[in-house]
Amino acid sequence: MNTYVAEIGEIVRSQRRDEEYIEDITERLSRVSKELLGQRTWIRWFPYLKSIASTLYYTSTVVLGNQTLGEEYVHLFESNGLERTVPSIPSRISFVLLHSAFPLISNYLIQKAESTLTHPSTESFLGIPIRKNQKARQSFLDVFFWLRTKLFPQLQRAHIALFYITGAYYSIARRFTGIRFLSASAHSDIPALKVYRFLGYITLIQLAVSIGISLYSFLEQEKFNNKLKKEKKENNGGSDRNLDENSLFHPTFQCSICLENKNPSALFCGHLFCWTCIQEHAVAATSSASTSSARCPQCRLEFQPRDVTPLLNL
């Protein structure tokens, strides 16, 4: 059978179809886990259900050497680069781990690090004392926040832009493992290729502008902070006060997802979660192509990320 290099449109349609099936598996896992394990356990495991569903889906297809349902839909076949050979088992296993498990593990480790940093009893982090050094504590928190909200999303956007321009490696995991797609169809949609390439360049320009704005905002904020510190020193006779350790957590509140008592935030329905958990849940839900809103993990009320209200005086 003759095979051809898969085009961008075919790969995108295949991935969208796979994402639809993964969403369906996630919904089924959610219903089953809620009925069997109870609501409290379900709430705690809800953020991980999509990664579990993705791991199960790709293990039963890619690892076993089968086509995914999306690949069957558009007649695509996985290949070791453009050599027209089946990817090796280690490559397929590595793809599943990088694509499904690595984001979950990295996000979990970052959350645990942030939880450790925000706890007032933590003496040191990575060998650096932070118990009485609130500046170092806040610097670590800023770094992890930047990794989670800036670096990882920007890298994903840059990779998608490169995919639109070159037509190779839809996901970062496929780029690392060298797995590409071959197609059984010989047709070529030149106008669509031009549109995708245009979108790629627009995305890169948007990314560059976003990075420039972020850098400018950071420099302006640093300038403002330095000015504020100088004014405080003048007003306080040269003394510099440390932040109150207890300002980092709230002993009367506990997030029902991560069970931490930090940064309480409320939804319209009245349920409380920590800012990190509910924002990540909302962003993950709204980033899916199948839905435009998230749902409260407890009562399933629809909401947008902008509807989350931080409670600063709890």
From Swiss-Prot:
It comes from the Eukaryota. One of its GO terms (molecular function) is transferase activity. Residues 1-7, 61-90, 167-197 are peroxisomal matrix. Pfam families: Pex2_Pex12 (PF04757), zf-RING_UBOX (PF13445). A zinc finger (RING-type) spans 255-300. Zn(2+) 2 binds at C269, H271, C296, C299. One of its GO terms (biological process) is protein ubiquitination. The lineage of its organism: Eukaryota, Metazoa, Ecdysozoa, Nematoda, Chromadorea. The chain crosses the membrane at residues 8-37, 39-60, 91-110, 143-166, 198-218. Residues 38, 111-142, 219-314 are cytoplasmic. This is Peroxisome biogenesis factor 10. The keyword Calcium does not apply. Pathway: Protein modification; protein ubiquitination. The E3 ubiquitin-protein ligase activity is stimulated by PEX12/prx-12. It comes from Caenorhabditis elegans. Keywords: Membrane, Metal-binding, Peroxisome, Peroxisome biogenesis, Protein transport, Transferase, Transmembrane, Transmembrane helix, Transport, Ubl conjugation pathway, Zinc, Zinc-finger. E3 ubiquitin-protein ligase component of a retrotranslocation channel required for peroxisome organization by mediating export of the PEX5/prx-5 receptor from peroxisomes to the cytosol, thereby promoting PEX5/prx-5 recycling. The retrotranslocation channel is composed of PEX2/prx-2, PEX10/prx-10 and PEX12/prx-12; each subunit contributing transmembrane segments that coassemble into an open channel that specifically allows the passage of PEX5/prx-5 through the peroxisomal membrane. PEX10/prx-10 also regulates PEX5 recycling by acting as a E3 ubiquitin-protein ligase. It catalyses: S-ubiquitinyl-[E2 ubiquitin-conjugating enzyme]-L-cysteine + [acceptor protein]-L-lysine = [E2 ubiquitin-conjugating enzyme]-L-cysteine + N(6)-ubiquitinyl-[acceptor protein]-L-lysine. Its EC number is 2.3.2.27. Coiled coil: none annotated.
